[in-house]
């Protein structure tokens, strides 16, 4: 599938990283991330992530299993930190500042679970006018945001771009592609 410019649609998948054995992502969230990646690839989209573990790894694995292309913006300069399912690796050496690249390197964003880093990526996308769809029931900030949004869909009073919600991997991917096709309003609110 192509975006508003005629290029392949890039969908960012953001969510919780598994940093160590004591910080796991639950099995249902991992399965949802896998399915989201698989569905994006099946529609001809490109999966963009931060390239590490957890949601990033599983969405990349799903995309690869469906024959898709995956891109990652790593926080470090070490290519070996990328998960095994990344095709195109960009080492940034930027630490968490790489969230700017992850959020801006896609036509729309899908949020699955997540902590403060994921929330940071979402707010960057929102501030830029880039559409985002949140998978409800996936834990973390994905399950907390709806109750605090302005009018149930905006991160602040500027009402830059609506944040959408979906209950299934199929619905979240459909909404993300539709949002990407509409073009959002990227770059208007930098």
Model-found features: residue ranges?
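Phosphate/ribose-phosphate-bearing ligand recognition and processing surfaces
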Residues: 124-152
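Generic N-terminal amphipathic, Lys/Arg-enriched alpha-helix
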Residues: 6-26, 37-38, 43
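Acidic/glycine-enriched connector segments
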Residues: 4-5, 19, 30-39, 51-123, ...
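Short, amphipathic alpha-helical "lid/cap" segments that border enzyme active or binding sites
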Residues: 34-37, 169-174
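C-terminal amphipathic helix plus adjacent low-complexity
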Residues: 174, 178-190
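Short, conserved catalytic or adaptor-binding loops enriched in Gly and charged residues
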Residues: 81-83, 151-159
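Short acidic-hydrophobic, aromatic-tinged amphipathic segments that line or gate anion-handling sites
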Residues: 89-93, 160-172
């Amino acid at each position: 599938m192509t975006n508003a410019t005629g290029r392949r649609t890039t969908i960012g998948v953001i969510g919780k990283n598994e940093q160590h054995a004591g910080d796991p992502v639950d099995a249902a969230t991992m399965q949802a991330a896998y399915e989201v990646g698989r569905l994006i690839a099946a529609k001809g989209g490109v999966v963009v992530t931060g390239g590490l573990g957890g949601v990033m790894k599983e969405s990349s694995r799903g995309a690869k299993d469906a024959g898709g292309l995956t891109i990652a913006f790593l926080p470090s300069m070490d290519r070996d930190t990328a998960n095994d399912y990344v095709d195109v690796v960009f080492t940034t050496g930027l630490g968490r500042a790489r969230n700017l690249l992850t959020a801006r390197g896609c036509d729309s964003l899908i949020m699955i679970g997540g902590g403060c880093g994921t929330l940071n990526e979402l707010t960057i996308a929102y501030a830029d006018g880039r559409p985002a769809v949140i998978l409800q029931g996936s834990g973390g900030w994905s399950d907390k945001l709806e109750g605090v949004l302005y009018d149930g869909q905006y991160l602040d009073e500027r009402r830059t771009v609506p944040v959408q919600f979906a209950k299934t991997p199929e619905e979240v991917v459909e909404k993300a592609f539709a949002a990407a096709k509409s073009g959002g309003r990227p770059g208007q609110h930098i």
